[in-house]
Amino acid sequence: MAPTPPEPLLLDSHKYILSWEHYYIISDYDDLQCPVNNCIFTHDKNLYNGDYSQFDAILFYERSLTLPVEYLPINRTSSQLYVFATIESSYNYPACELYFDNFFNWTMTYRLNSDIGWPYFVVRNLTGHILAPSVNVKWPNHKDIPISPNVIEKLANKTRAAGWLVSHCRAESMRDEYLTRLQEHLYHFSLQIDVFGACSNIRCRYSSCEEMFTRDYYFYMAFENSFDEDYVTEKVLHGYDNYAVPIVYGGANYTSSAIKSPSRKRLAKPHQVEAIRLHRNR
């Protein structure tokens, strides 16, 4: 008969936080490098012999909203925090059940007004300080940021106008319909947006597509699948990572997340579209 495993050693000075689902791995939290180091995250619901009320906090992810209520904890204490955590849009996981009214104490989401921010990405300056996302972002002057010769060379060798890699078709944001209308306008300038992935007849491996965008495309279509406030996903990064300007489409104020808003004088004039066409044909 195998020996009974020892009871886990619980430290009074630590906060124990239970992740209700096994949806996210604990190492995700380690990567956040939180300055508070007395918190212990766990998936072990039996840490207190099944008494969930003993945890200092419980994280519930978006999938909890789809669970029958009998699968959720019943007993809780007034000092215990129930935290709703998600990086998914509210359209995909709406919290419409009356059961969840006054159920959560805190939120941990991509929303800028969340109790705990959980964005898809952060923007740092050259010294490592986080600039965005934030309600009031102080973007540095672009003139103070040097452009390396390597970047200039990559941009000079591009030949295609815009591309898009997409796998989720017929999204709630109607981005497919918007793209169709945009293609109609670009046709008059002999330009087009090349679409790759599950929603197109053109397929390529992810790594091959990334190399192609880096080599060929000036612009990348960063279209979100939902129009939600502050919802900015990694799609913007696909443009930046491939030395392409992301063209954004979503419900967020992108100047709070990833893009410095230019003055109206610096916005592209209609004749510049024609200039891009001529450059492509040279």
Q: Where do the language-model regions lie?
A:
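A short, histidine- and acid-enriched strand-loop-helix "catalytic/donor-clamping" loop
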Residues: I87-Y91
